[in-house]
């Protein structure tokens, strides 16, 4: 398990796994080998793939409903990256030209078979990372976390000073009693 993808517009919340083998595609979204790991960064182009029309579960069945500007969130390593859809293309299965790296952009492409039930082509939805502005709730949580950290640090320092003073007092008492 690498992380999760969340596309609220089409009700997708799925796990992401590395590799494109059938066993991976049967349980979630596949991170295609030889593409950037989905952790973001300028010059990266991560490619994720999932089934359409799988008999037991809905994966990327509604990917074609995404429109330019729609958000895609990818959560990996306790960080959530937000991407905005910039393009939708239908290509032959062997056409990988849209998956190339752009050294000035942080890109994510989602691929699935198309059209539904025929699977003669691939639908590629490309998205570019957008900067996120912290919501007021996030800012309050960050400030609260900083205060908690300051309090814990202060408590540790106070305990350490008390331990040093107690050690000196015990040693002095032992010397006086000896």
What is the role of each PLM region?
Residues 1-151:
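Solvent-exposed, non-transmembrane regions of membrane-associated and secreted proteins
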Residues 139-178:
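C-terminal single-pass membrane-anchor helix
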